[in-house]
């Protein structure tokens, strides 16, 4: 019902997902609501059923005319929002430097890490920085809080267009 509605950021970009809606839902054991959403979606898919969604209510877009570098910051499944922005920028071949910082408790929470590393390898203007709070000894990324990692890497953010 109406009281069961929850917001999920859309990860799909109009450039990459024509006719599809991609959501990133953190359905961990401690998040009963997210698990229920995932189970309801699975059941609807298996039974050729329907899921009712409410249209997006946000008003976010990339300032394409800006020549400033972009700083995309996300934690956990909040990555879906910056994923959509990154996809759009890559599809539009924006030349701005793009710095994407994505943080999670541990590496397994960075579920699209290899894909982002591939994107960064293909596009010289894309810089991906994974950040984990709990790192194994062989971890090559940053450790700690994602916002602290950004703070450590930049003296000032005044010259950036920031999406968080």
Swiss-Prot record:
Gene Ontology BP annotations: bioluminescence
Binding site for pyridine: 75-79
Keywords, alphabetical: FAD, Flavoprotein, Luminescence, Oxidoreductase
E.C. numbers: 1.5.1.-
Main function: Involved in bioluminescence. It is a good supplier of reduced flavin mononucleotide (FMNH2) to the bioluminescence reaction. Preferably uses riboflavin as an electron acceptor when NADPH is used as an electron donor.
Name listed for the protein in its UniProt record: NAD(P)H-flavin reductase
Database matches in InterPro entries: FNR_nucleotide-bd, MRET, OxRdtase_FAD/NAD-bd, Riboflavin_synthase-like_b-brl
NCBIfam families reported for this sequence: PRK08051.1 (NF005963)
Any GO molecular function: oxidoreductase activity
PANTHER family: NAD(P)H-FLAVIN REDUCTASE, NADH OXIDOREDUCTASE HCR
UniProt cross-references to Gene3D superfamilies, sorted A to Z: Nucleotide-binding domain of ferredoxin-NADP reductase (FNR) module (3.40.50.80), Translation factors (2.40.30.10)
Gene name of the record: fre
Family label: Belongs to the Fre/LuxG FAD/NAD(P) flavoprotein oxidoreductase family.
